[in-house]
């Protein structure tokens, strides 16, 4: 079978992780191909999230990556990529009601401060000094002044555009269906179109779709597919610049520079989708978005008369231990993996892309360690 195209690196998945990795590899002079199964760049979770650039409440294994990104990469990203990614570093309030929420937030604070992050607990009055629009029912919050948010779609497209300018070749509508070994090494990617792509290294960064694809070479990443809801409101006068979240993690969001609010969250209503779909209704609009909206109003009643402009849902690749896999498994030479980001990959995307470029091109990440993200952590004991 004739090879359609070949490069040093073939990346499967044109989300923010894949595009960032492609950019940093091309910046070092590598030839790179990126394959995207849909016709739209960033069609998965990369364009369907709340845009949080969050250090607080991170798993300790991820915290060094996002702290590095916030300190060294996010501040200059718009200038570097030549496109405004709307990065705003105005802090993050994780809100709570009552003692149970306070205990959750205090535990998250203690875990983060132990690694050097500036995050602290506030009482209800202190919270409303920062954001006076919040409900009086808010009794506490964690506050990280160096957290923030950015525009996920613009960030994904900025990496895409900058990578193209460096010579990266993007192929849309090329759904990867299998990985093919040659002489004991992974060498080829076949697609649903019948095309064949060749690379010295294949980086699988296709979200939940990575699991089935990796099965073709005997690798299994324990992931689940979890639906996330996102809603966008009409524009309102400027109210606040912080990123918001909650102790029970039922929603997160922020106000954009344009005035609209972007919120996201996991409603857990998927088991009921079939009932609504059978009645000819859009399950996202009929049940999931209203559930998310009610959660938001419990904390933010000032938005009760604000109209929703649109809603959408997208799936995330939830890894078994809630942190991603970024590795080169020894049992499949030529393979690199970047998946399982569990809905919080956007904030670490610049650091992940940089480290993946080092992993692929040098054999090991050098800026920061990726040892905590190895595939073999799931091996039987």
PLM features per residue range, with description:
Residues 9-33:
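N-terminal Rossmann-like FAD-binding beta1-loop-alpha1 element of flavoenzymes
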Residues 50-130, 250-252, 280, 287, ...:
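Dinucleotide-binding Rossmann-like beta1-alpha1 core, especially the glycine-rich loop
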Residues 143-193, 197-200:
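Helical element adjacent to the flavin cofactor pocket in flavoenzyme catalytic cores
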């Amino acid at each position: 079978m004739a090879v359609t195209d070949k490069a040093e690196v073939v990346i499967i998945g044109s989300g923010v992780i894949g595009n960032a990795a492609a950019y940093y590899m091309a910046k070092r002079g590598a030839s790179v191909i990126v394959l995207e199964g849909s016709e739209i760049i960033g069609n998965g979770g990369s364009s369907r999230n709340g845009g949080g650039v969050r250090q607080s409440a991170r798993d300790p294994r991820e915290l060094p990556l996002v702290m590095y990104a916030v300190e060294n990469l996010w501040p200059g990203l718009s200038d570097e990529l030549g496109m405004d990614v709307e990065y705003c570093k105005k802090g993050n309030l994780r809100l709570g009601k009552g003692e149970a929420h306070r205990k959750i937030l205090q535990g998250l604070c203690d875990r983060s401060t132990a690694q050097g992050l500036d995050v602290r607990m506030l009482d209800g009055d202190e919270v409303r000094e920062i954001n006076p629009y919040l409900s009086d029912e808010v009794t506490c919050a964690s506050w990280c002044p160096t957290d923030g948010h950015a525009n996920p779609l613009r960030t994904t497209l900025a990496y895409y555009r900058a990578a193209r300018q460096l010579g990266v070749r993007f192929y849309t509508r090329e759904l990867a269906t299998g990985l093919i070994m040659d002489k004991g090494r992974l060498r080829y990617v076949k697609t649903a179109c019948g095309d064949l792509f060749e690379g010295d290294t294949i980086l699988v960064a296709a979200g939940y779709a990575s699991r089935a694809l990796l099965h073709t070479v005997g690798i299994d990443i324990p992931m689940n597919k979890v639906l996330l809801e996102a809603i966008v409101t009409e524009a309102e006068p400027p109210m606040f610049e912080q990123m918001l979240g909650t102790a029970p993690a039922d929603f997160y969001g922020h106000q954009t520079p344009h005035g609209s609010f972007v919120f996201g969250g996991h409603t857990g209503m998927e088991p009921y989708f079939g009932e609504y779909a059978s009645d000819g209704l859009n399950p996202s609009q009929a049940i999931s978005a209203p559930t998310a909206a009610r959660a938001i109003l419990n904390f933010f009643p000032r938005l009760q008369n604000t109209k929703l402009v649109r809603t959408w849902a997208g799936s995330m690749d939830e890894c078994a231990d809630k942190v991603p896999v970024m590795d080169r498994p020894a049992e499949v030479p030529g393979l690199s993996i970047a998946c399982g980001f569990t809905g919080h990959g956007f904030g670490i995307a610049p650091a992940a892309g940089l480290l993946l470029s080092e992993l692929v091109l040098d054999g090991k990440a050098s800026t920061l360690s990726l040892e905590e993200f190895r595939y073999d952590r799931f091996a039987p004991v």
